[in-house]
């Protein structure tokens, strides 16, 4: 690895495959548009499944978080996170929360107030911003938008 390479770390969990698809396409897009970078994907579900211990991040990172909630409407009820809680445990581990640039939420707009609610809850809980959101698997425009945000955060230079 070159000494001046920047490592972009994308921490995520994907249950239905939508977030996995988005993060993979985002990685490919970033690598095609910016030089001097490597992109590290960290799938929390794999760490849990393989029984690996959580660890402290060496580099700043961005979290990608789908919304899975227990029933309800996200206002009076139905705002209890299910299935994605290991991501919160990973962020809370050691000093990881301080290294997180922010969260990108995903969900389904049909769920109105519940749309990206988990990302908003993490933002409040850990004190980092919701950087962006996308619906379902995300479109190319979403990938370009999120890539631009990441480029700003990591101060990346575009390839000519």
Residue ranges and their predicted role:
Residues 57-160:
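FMN-binding flavodoxin-like domain, especially the glycine-rich phosphate-binding loop
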Residues 1-80, 84:
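N-terminal beta1-alpha1-beta2 submodule of the flavodoxin-like/Rossmannoid cofactor-binding fold
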């Amino acid at each position: 690895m070159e000494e001046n390479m920047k490592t972009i770390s994308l921490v995520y969990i994907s249950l239905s495959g939508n977030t996995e698809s988005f993060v993979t396409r985002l990685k490919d897009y970033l690598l095609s548009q910016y030089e001097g970078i490597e992109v590290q994907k960290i799938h929390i579900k794999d760490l849990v499944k393989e029984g690996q211990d959580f660890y402290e991040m060496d580099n700043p990172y961005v979290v990608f978080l789908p919304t899975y909630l227990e029933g309800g409407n996200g206002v009076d009820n139905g705002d209890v996170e299910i299935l994605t809680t290991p991501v919160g445990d990973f962020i809370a581990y050691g000093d990881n929360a301080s290294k997180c640039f922010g969260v990108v939420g995903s969900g389904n707009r049909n769920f109105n107030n519940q749309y990206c609610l988990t990302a908003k809850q993490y933002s409040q809980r850990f004190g980092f911003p919701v950087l962006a959101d996308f619906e379902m698997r995300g479109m190319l425009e979403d990938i370009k938008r999120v890539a631009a945000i990441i480029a700003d955060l990591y101060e990346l230079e575009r390839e000519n």
